[in-house]
Amino acid sequence: MAKYVGAHVSASGGVENAPKNAQAIGAKAFALFTKNQRQWKAKPLSKENIEKFNEHLECCGIEKKHILPHDSYLINLGHPEEEKRQKSLEAFLDEVRRCEQLGLDKLNFHPGSHLKKISEEECLDRIADAMNETLRQSSGVTLVIENTAGQGSNLGYKFEHLRYLIDKSIDKSRVGVCLDTAHMFAAGYDIRTKEAYDKTMQAFDEIVGFEYLKGMHINDSKAKFASRVDRHHSLGKGEIGLDAFRFIMNDPRLDDIPLILETIDDTIWDKEIELLYSFVE
């Protein structure tokens, strides 16, 4: 069984540092921001950034297909105001181009929020339009939609939202999904027992389909079940408990995709990675 576990590591000081940070915690996969995620604008990646990134990647033996870049949290492709949506779209395109430059084939993003100004469907249509515009203007990068906890006016908390965006897509070969365990749980999808896990994963397969699953975020949840609150926790310390992660590590449908920790204490990521691998039966 081939599981590729890692964490969302820092790219502080340059993207080329991310592979080294992943290697330091014993990761076989990783996520990163390819630019400062708190700013709209960022200076372009230099030739040196790109060359060193590739060099460091080779040294640490992590394959590009096991890297899941994440876009900036500022981006809202479903923004109700056209000017702000346009700003988000331009920033999103820039993120996709950065992935292209680094030879990375995925970009993970949160779908968007209606800010209580438009309906959920209108918001989903805006997100779908932005995705299609991005697909038209780029190549080689799969847009990976993350499920959300449904906090505030964030969409993506139902599997049906993810399916809707896939259905509206002009190129389904370049769209995928990332499942975040904490978000699933907070949105009302239980994974705490084998029975609950199987039921949730069956629903995911029927509504979205495992062929679209391009990665997972492995998090426990501080927030209660179905609370629609997005609060991550260290594995086994939250409301989900360790069994769910044991089910994940032994589920062959989750082979060969990046399984990324975004748990709250980065000083124990190496231990959490070890723990997850120890679950493999």
From Swiss-Prot:
Binding site for Zn(2+) 3: 183, 230, 232
Pfam families (alphabetical): AP_endonuc_2
Manner of cofactor binding, per the entry note: Binds 3 Zn(2+) ions.
EC id: 3.1.21.2
Organism superkingdom: Bacteria
Chain positions recorded as Zn(2+) 1 binding sites: 70, 110, 146
PANTHER family per UniProt: APURINIC-APYRIMIDINIC ENDONUCLEASE (PTHR21445:SF0), ENDONUCLEASE IV ENDODEOXYRIBONUCLEASE IV (PTHR21445)
Function comment: Endonuclease IV plays a role in DNA repair. It cleaves phosphodiester bonds at apurinic or apyrimidinic (AP) sites, generating a 3'-hydroxyl group and a 5'-terminal sugar phosphate.
Protein name per Swiss-Prot or TrEMBL: Probable endonuclease 4
Organism: Nitratiruptor sp. (strain SB155-2)
